[in-house]
């Protein structure tokens, strides 16, 4: 009994592992929708800020820069709702109503939360908020959402809302309410239920999320401490995991918290903290006591609180036009009771409330968002006056806590460990007077230990720009000379894609499934080293999407050109170092293990060779009548997918064969394509989609019969093995000529209005890729067979939306509605279908006067789908018959003639 239970449990795990991976892959596809707009938003931010910050006082130029910048600002400020809408649409079969409902859900949820978030002190003399039983919740836990003070759930909240909305949509989109409130039935009910569910979700988040926010801050702090004390180990670990998750498509879900939330660091915690700086090369700490006068370079603006002795922070008042000596004199006499906060310094440097604006737009939390926030804040490159009389320029290094003590002391911004730090007795002499103030460095710690702007993204640049192209060159040169051109066309374009756009999958997938040890043991390790060295050597190169050359110029070279110390020069240095490892390693291992990378390995099967093999199969068919051609081809497909034991799930739609396998390394895509697939795609590493046109469902059924034991697999394999052998083929006997009906009339299967195929919103039908015919806009849901007598249901799709009929040897396809395959896509065999009530079975014969082949709930179908119905004579029949339309427009009744098919060999 115990053994049986273990087997059942293991079988359950294996069955659900594939579906979980598909779900995660779908989640990542959803995350990519908002992430895809970030590059352009980042360009708007970068270019807009560059124009605005260098406007030289020209109002029109500054306004234009701000105009461009705000286009990017709005995207980053609203990332959570973008994630919510994207996830909702992804998991609801691209339903626009689901996206709308997600927005309603998000807005109402945040409105409910805002009413229960109470400031600790309404007069703002104390910071923080009280939320239910949480007291003095820090500002970093709160964000401005749609103009409301709400919990800063960031992209996590967006994903939660999107997932719940998708669930509610899929559950209620077809709901029928009593007639008295029938207006709210169907999809109109979805936003209503979302608004209702937003209440308990808001309360649950208020009960839990403040603790989550605190935990995220602790994670960020822990990673920062690991980075500061562990020589960049946080980036090393991150780099490997991020690359290792690429095959599973879940890397977006992994890096999103570190890029976009306080887990990647937060500047909000130092808003009201004193500004202490340890300048490069100094062995002491100083206070910031002012900033350079905008109107008079070389002169300083001193906060009135520091100059006049008012207790507390400066509260906006300033004394302008001070030289450093007089500024220090004022400060020395009053310094002990006053300090300048980071919020005040940022606002003073930018002459506006820029700190609050950055917080409102969510640009003070997360490694990448902080980089963007600093980039557009207006404080980088600005000078401040220190309490030792020297000036200091604010750069990325002010906040970058990255490097070990043997070449730098990490971030320049510090905070006292506890209490008031003691001043060094002998102050530095300025202008002959000991009127400066310095402090003991041992009493300070890094202000934001968890922060190094862009530390979780910049590591991509060296290996994407230089490392991968070097590996690609090695793989090209490892191919035989006669096939290097072939290898270059595939590998070269993939490597160039990595360089220009930072999209690496085309290159990585050329060897990932062929040699996973090369991916995980070499490539992912070198990617981790790239992240580690960029962090360790104190780089701060930003990005919005990936490590592309475009991002390198915009967020590395340009900031360095402005003196902001992004240290982008490290990218080519580290990249060349990695290339010296990538090239010989990939070259040697490709040859040593004879990896069948593009241009290497076994001889590629040509189309000519495939046709010859197919002819041999037809020859064998004459000597073994136990198997038809479809079964033989299905057997070959089954082998191409690694055998029946490698099939985890098998399905098909109107044109695509969908196969989930257990081990993707066993799949031979070349054979699948040579068997007629127009293309083979992967949406997850184990999920293959092969485009076979209308043969997809036929192959699916035949393969399923083999897997279920309905076909003798042992005998079929003998036939397949014989086709692969070199024995002499028997003589091909002439194919007997069958009697063919000269003219065949196809009848309308339903009442409705005729439309040309050009009006069908599906390129497959509009462009007549599978055949020719007409479209019918049905007026009722009673569909009948398209002939008077002996109409065979050649194929009935399990989703109930499409059928292929055999009318006297002519294949005719009926496809009810557009994209309607989605309605019952998740139904298991035997489950009752929605919308479609199928009355016929595959292989059955029916007549026009018998009961309908399918009854359709047309009202329910129209709620979400276009009911226009393509009625197509398949291309395989058009090869032998000429189609002559009888009716092409206007109303049509069921049973009325639509086409006449004339046999092409008919003698006139």
UniProtKB/Swiss-Prot annotation:
Cysteines paired by S-S bonds: none
Keyword Nuclease attached: no
TM segment ranges: 31-51, 71-91, 100-120, 155-175, 189-209, 459-479, 487-507, 509-529, 536-556, 571-591
Enzyme class label: transferase
A molecular-function term among this protein's GO annotations: protein-phosphocysteine-sugar phosphotransferase activity
Classification via InterPro entries: Dup_hybrid_motif, Glu_permease_IIB, PTrfase_EIIB_Cys, PTS_EIIA_1_perm, PTS_EIIC, PTS_EIIC_1, PTS_Glucose_EIICBA, PTS_IIB_1
PTS EIIA type-1 domain boundaries: 762-875
GO biological process, one term: phosphoenolpyruvate-dependent sugar phosphotransferase system
Chief location category: membrane
Domain-level remarks: The EIIC domain forms the PTS system translocation channel and contains the specific substrate-binding site. The EIIB domain is phosphorylated by phospho-EIIA on a cysteinyl or histidyl residue, depending on the transported sugar. Then, it transfers the phosphoryl group to the sugar substrate concomitantly with the sugar uptake processed by the EIIC domain.
Known function: The phosphoenolpyruvate-dependent sugar phosphotransferase system (sugar PTS), a major carbohydrate active transport system, catalyzes the phosphorylation of incoming sugar substrates concomitantly with their translocation across the cell membrane. This system is involved in glucose transport.
Full protein name: PTS system glucose-specific EIICBA component
Gene source species: Mycoplasma genitalium (strain ATCC 33530 / DSM 19775 / NCTC 10195 / G37) (Mycoplasmoides genitalium)
Lineage, uppermost ranks: Bacteria, Bacillati, Mycoplasmatota, Mycoplasmoidales, Mycoplasmoidaceae
Gene label: ptsG
């Amino acid at each position: 009994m115990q053994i049986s239970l273990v087997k059942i449990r293991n079988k359950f795990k294996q069955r659900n592992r594939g579906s979980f991976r598909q779900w995660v892959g779908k989640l990542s596809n959803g995350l990519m929708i908002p992430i895809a707009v970030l590059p352009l938003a980042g360009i708007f931010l970068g270019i807009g800020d560059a124009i605005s910050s260098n406007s030289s006082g020209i109002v029109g130029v500054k306004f234009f820069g701000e105009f461009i910048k705000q286009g990017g600002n709005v995207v980053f400020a609203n990332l959570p709702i973008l994630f919510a809408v994207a996830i909702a649409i992804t998991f609801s079969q691209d339903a626009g109503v689901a996206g709308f409902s997600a927005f309603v859900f998000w807005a109402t949820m945040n409105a409910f939360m805002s009413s229960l978030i109470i400031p600790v002190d309404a007069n703002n003399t104390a910071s923080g908020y009280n939320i239910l039983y949480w007291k003095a919740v820090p500002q970093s836990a709160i964000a401005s959402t749609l103009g409301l003070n709400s919990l800063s759930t960031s992209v996590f909240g967006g994903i939660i809302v999107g997932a719940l909305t998708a669930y509610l949509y899929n559950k209620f989109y077809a709901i029928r309410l009593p007639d008295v409130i029938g207006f709210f039935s169907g999809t109109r009910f979805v936003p209503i239920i979302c608004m209702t569910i937003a209440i308990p979700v808001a309360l649950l988040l208020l009960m839990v999320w403040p603790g989550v926010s605190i935990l995220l801050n602790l994670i960020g702090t822990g990673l920062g401490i690991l980075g500061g004390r562990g020589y960049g180990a946080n980036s090393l670990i991150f780099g490997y995991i991020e690359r290792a998750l690429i095959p599973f498509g879940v890397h977006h879900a992994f890096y999103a918290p570190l890029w976009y939330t306080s887990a990647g660091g937060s500047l909000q915690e130092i808003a009201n903290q004193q500004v202490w700086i340890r300048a490069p090369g100094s062995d002491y700490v100083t206070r910031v006591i002012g900033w350079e006068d905008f109107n008079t370079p070389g002169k300083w603006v001193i906060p009135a609180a520091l100059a006049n002795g008012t207790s507390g922070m400066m509260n906006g008042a300033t004394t302008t036009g001070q030289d450093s000596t007089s500024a220090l004199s004022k400060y020395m006499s009053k310094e002990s009771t006053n300090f300048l906060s980071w919020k005040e310094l940022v606002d003073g440097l930018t002459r506006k409330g820029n700190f609050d604006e950055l917080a409102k737009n969510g640009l003070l939390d997360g490694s990448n968002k902080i980089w963007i926030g600093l980039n557009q804040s207006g404080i980088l490159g600005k000078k401040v006056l220190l309490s030792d009389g020297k000036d200091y320029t604010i750069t990325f290094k002010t906040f970058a806590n990255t490097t070990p003590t043997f070449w730098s002391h990490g971030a320049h911004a510090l905070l006292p460990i506890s209490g008031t730090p003691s001043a060094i007795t002998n102050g530095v002499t300025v202008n002959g007077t000991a009127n400066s103030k310095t402090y003991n460095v041992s009493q300070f710690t890094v202000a934001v230990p968890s922060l190094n702007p862009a530390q979780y993204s910049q590591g991509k640049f060296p290996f994407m720009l230089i490392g991968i192209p070097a590996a690609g060159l090695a793989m090209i040169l490892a191919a035989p000379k006669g096939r290097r051109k072939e290898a270059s066309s595939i590998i070269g374009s993939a490597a160039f894609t990595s360089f220009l756009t930072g999209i690496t999958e085309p290159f990585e997938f050329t060897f990932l499934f062929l040699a996973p040890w090369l991916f995980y043991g070499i490539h992912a390790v070198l990617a981790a080293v790239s992240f580690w060295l960029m962090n360790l050597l104190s780089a701060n190169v930003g990005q919005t999407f990936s490590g592309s050359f475009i991002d390198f110029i915009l967020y590395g070279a340009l900031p360095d050109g402005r003196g902001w110390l992004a240290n982008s020069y490290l990218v080519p240095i580290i990249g060349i170092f990695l290339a010296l490892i990538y090239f010989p390693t990939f070259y040697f291992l490709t040859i040593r293990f004879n990896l069948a990378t593009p241009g290497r390995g076994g001889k590629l099967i040509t189309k000519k060779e495939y046709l010859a093999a197919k002819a041999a199969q037809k020859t064998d068919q004459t000597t073994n009548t136990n198997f038809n051609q479809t079964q033989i081809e299905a057997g070959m497909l089954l082998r191409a997918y690694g055998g029946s034991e490698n099939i985890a799930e098998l399905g098909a739609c109107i044109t695509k064969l969908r196969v989930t396998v257990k081990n993707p390394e066993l799949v031979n895509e070349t054979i699948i394509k040579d068997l007629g697939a127009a293309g083979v795609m992967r949406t997850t590493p184990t999920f293959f989609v092969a485009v076979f046109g209308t043969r997809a469902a036929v192959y699916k059924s035949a393969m399923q019969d083999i897997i279920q034991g309905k076909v003798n697999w042992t005998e079929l394999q003998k036939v397949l093995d014989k086709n692969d052998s070199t024995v002499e083929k028997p003589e091909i006997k002439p194919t007997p000529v069958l009697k063919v009906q000269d003219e065949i009339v196809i009848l309308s299967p339903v009442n409705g209005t005729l439309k040309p195929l050009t009006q069908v919103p599906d390129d497959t039908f509009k462009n007549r890729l599978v055949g020719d015919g007409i479209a019918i806009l049905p007026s009722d849901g009673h569909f009948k067979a398209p002939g008077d007598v002996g109409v065979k249901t050649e194929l009935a799709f399990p989703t109930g939306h499409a059928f292929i009929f055999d009318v006297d040897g002519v294949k005719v396809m009926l496809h009810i509605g557009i994209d309607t395959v989605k309605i019952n896509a998740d139904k298991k065999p035997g489950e009752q279908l929605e919308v479609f009530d199928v009355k016929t079975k595959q292989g059955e014969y029916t007549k026009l006067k018998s009961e309908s082949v399918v009854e359709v709930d047309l009202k329910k179908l129209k709620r979400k789908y276009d009911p226009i119905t393509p009625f197509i004579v398949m291309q395989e029949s058009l090869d032998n018959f000429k189609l002559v339309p009888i009716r092409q427009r206007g109303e049509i009744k069921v049973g009325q003639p639509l086409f006449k098919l004339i046999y092409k060999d008919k003698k006139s």
